[in-house]
Amino acid sequence: MFEHAGQGYAGHGTLCGALGVCSCLINLVIYDKNFTYAAVIDRMMWWYAQMHFPTERFDNISNFPGQIKAKAMTPLCHTSVSKWTLTAGVKVTSKEKYERCAKVAGEVVFTVVHYLNEYFAGRWTPAKWTPSEETTQCIECHGPETYQRYANEDGLNHQQGHMECLLCHPDHMKALLTKRPTK
């Protein structure tokens, strides 16, 4: 049913397929008037971005236990996988990479089931996304006003998202930092 989500949706390397599939499932089972599903999905996304994958959870059933880990930094498949393959020194078409992604998918599902159990037991407390200092500086100018404490009122209001800006825009930040007065 969700085979199309593999390799970042039909090989495009966009959103990690495990995140997309779990987002659909979260939406199906936690659709309420408070839009709690969005908070659960948001938490899942930034949890993923902060994780060092693959974990050891599935090593006992793995052909490649003890694989090298790399921090995902983003929910994007191509970034997460590329960082890992470069760190591990393997090709994107290797059996090691496919095993890594299977472990990541299992870890995402395991974590989402934990979140859902918290929700249905009445213990769910949504954590709030907190951007890095660098991303906060980007949001001050580019973010929508709905990022209340991060964006200023006269911001450009043409950026949305909770990803780290520097992953794709490192030169922009360098230029910004050279123009700012030092403290």
Describe every region a protein language model picked out.
Residues 1-3, 83:
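Acidic-glycine-rich active-site phosphate/pyrophosphate-binding loop
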Residues 5-14, 93-97:
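A short glycine/serine-rich beta->alpha loop
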Residues 10-24:
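Conserved phosphate/anionic-ligand binding catalytic regions in large, soluble enzymes, centered on
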Residues 136-145, 162-171:
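The canonical Cys-X-X-Cys-His
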Residues 22-26, 41-117, 124-129, 136-139:
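Amphipathic alpha-helical interface segments
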Residues 153-160:
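Short linker/helix segments within small regulatory modules
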Residues 1, 28-43:
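Phosphate-handling active-site elements
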Residues 148-152, 175-179:
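Short Cys/His-rich "knuckle" micro-motifs
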